[in-house]
Amino acid sequence: MRLAVIGGDGIGPEVVAEGLRVLRAVHPKVETTDYDLGARRWHETGETLPDSVLAELRGHDAILLGAVGDPGVPSGVLERGLLLRLRFELDHHVNLRPVRLYPGVTSPLAGDPAIDMIVVREGTEGPYAGAGGTLRRGTPQEVATEESLNTRFGVERVVRDAFARASRRPRAHLTLVHKTNVLTKAGDLWARTVAEVGAEFPAVSVDYQHVDAASMFFVTDPARFDVVVTDNMFGDILTDIGAAITGGIGLAASGNLDPSGANPSMFEPVHGSAPDIAGQGLADPTATVASVAMLLDHLGHADEAARVEGAVAASLAARAAAGGARRSTREIGDDLATRAAG
């Protein structure tokens, strides 16, 4: 496996180091290349993602990212210049976010709800495509536009991915989330595409929720969801709700995928760089390790992925049974690597 590693800023390098230890515990043949990208590089050079680095990244099987950013970088610089550019250039059109409540993890929701869903979020279109502009900026007549771009090609490929994932799960249920009653043009495209592709997956049951209703049901009845497919912005919001109800953003893993394999997919914890605790051994690497499980699964190493996922579940349950005593980044990494190694 040829793996590009972007430790990034703050706690990013710390959690990535533990993720790599767990990866090597189950898959020793890993060749890594480290890339200095993020806030530190921007402060020193003004660069976010040089073309030469992007070209090198394309030569890897996958990318493991820690976290990027610090308060000194203006909003949007790293988001658009690095993270979104990687998504667009590497065609990461599927953003995959598991939403699972592990045994022993406390949810803020009452009643110990059963939560086990996957959100399949479109990753290269919608309002994040960068279309729009500003007129008469800084004047009382200022106009700002952000256009949501939805193509049949882009919608269909993410919908197909979602149906395929639903067909492999026991419940085989897919929910389209949109706002078809107001966003009638884009909503119609999404709804028709789901209906047409769904005809090819007769074993998958399908329903629809407006995004506002889905937001409520994520909190009041999350067990109703199995696989959710939605556009870029709605998915961005819903998945953070999903993280909040399953133990917090610190346990949330994600994958930015080109399922075709033409480009390396990227895997990362959802949390930020947390510069206030960097270097203190306080960061929990569990989300990074869960992202490593997704990486292995994506590259076809299902058995190794299951071992890492099992290690995450067992470690979280053991920590809960021990009363949730604080452990260092390294200690958690030790535990996860030992469990994964079997």
Swiss-Prot record:
Necessary cofactors: Mg(2+); Mn(2+)
Binding site for NAD(+): G272, S273, A274, P275, D276, I277, A278, G279, Q280, G281, L282, A283, D284
EC nos: 1.1.1.85
Key words, A-Z: Amino-acid biosynthesis, Branched-chain amino acid biosynthesis, Cytoplasm, Leucine biosynthesis, Magnesium, Manganese, Metal-binding, NAD, Oxidoreductase
Database matches in Pfam families: Iso_dh
Places the protein is found: Cytoplasm
Pathway: Amino-acid biosynthesis; L-leucine biosynthesis; L-leucine from 3-methyl-2-oxobutanoate: step 3/4
Record site: Important for catalysis: Y128, K179
Domain of life from the UniProt record: Bacteria
Molecular function GO terms recorded: 3-isopropylmalate dehydrogenase activity; magnesium ion binding; NAD binding
Gene Ontology biological process terms in this record: L-leucine biosynthetic process
Family assignment from sequence similarity: Belongs to the isocitrate and isopropylmalate dehydrogenases family. LeuB type 2 subfamily.
Role this protein plays: Catalyzes the oxidation of 3-carboxy-2-hydroxy-4-methylpentanoate (3-isopropylmalate) to 3-carboxy-4-methyl-2-oxopentanoate. The product decarboxylates to 4-methyl-2 oxopentanoate.
Subunit structure: Homodimer.
Protein name: 3-isopropylmalate dehydrogenase
Gene field: leuB
